[in-house]
Amino acid sequence: MGKATVTWVQRLQFVGTDSTRHSVVISAPDEANGVGMKPSELLLVSLGACTAYDVVNILQKKRKILHHLHVEVEGEQQTSAPWPFTRIHLHYVIAGEGLSERDVAQAIHLSHEKYCSVSATLRPSVELTYDFELTADGEHSAP
């Protein structure tokens, strides 16, 4: 079972801590308090990290050599409170040795459909889409 705590620091700043005591700063998006991530964008980071973890793990189990992976996650929200996400798109940029488009597509699909708990949690109410870009070493764009 997952467990986390969120502790108020000051103004609209908080520290989130997981069960192994790793922490992240969370804050409001305005400049005065903007030292941490917005909670809604932390959700996007969580989704990207969850699926990136799976993709790397799956490809490494297939003995593929990865040189680079980053996931660009973009979410669309309703325009009124409580501003739920309605659609989230993930764009994977990946480079490595001996990677085929089939290998990458299969790893991403398995992550979203079988392994990523964040995807599974969001899927019933949020449209999740993804694509990927398989690049040669040194050709990937900066995150």
State each model region's role.
Residues M1-V45, V56-P143:
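Extended beta-strand/beta-hairpin segments
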